[in-house]
Amino acid sequence: MVIEDISSILRQEAEAVLNIPVVAEYNEAVTLIVEYVHNRNGKLITSGMGKAGQIASNLATTFSSTGTPAFFLHPSEAQHGDLGIVRDNDIMLLISNSGKTRELIELTRLTLGLAPDMKF
């Protein structure tokens, strides 16, 4: 791979980010993250399965590296003990292609059992 190829890939990725549609749901998500993480001293918890899980993991890493407390919680691991890290002032960002991912539905149910006011 040469410099021109790398530059082209980076330009394409930057353009993709710039073209993210800013709709009401996006604005609401950003507002919730600011409220819970920065105003309430919570954490941003991301989760997803498969490729969506890789995206969620990358998001958590990016947020963490820019000063926003965040981590990736694998849905299956959450069911076997890792859910104990979740607190009431945290917020979850769940990534799913279909919106019907079985493991994320179960993660939501289990989380609400521990933190009934959790925002997703």
Where are these regions (language model features)?
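An N-terminal, well-structured beta->alpha segment
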Residues: 1-42
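Glycine-rich phosphate-binding loops that contact phosphosugars or nucleotide phosphates
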Residues: 34-38, 43-120
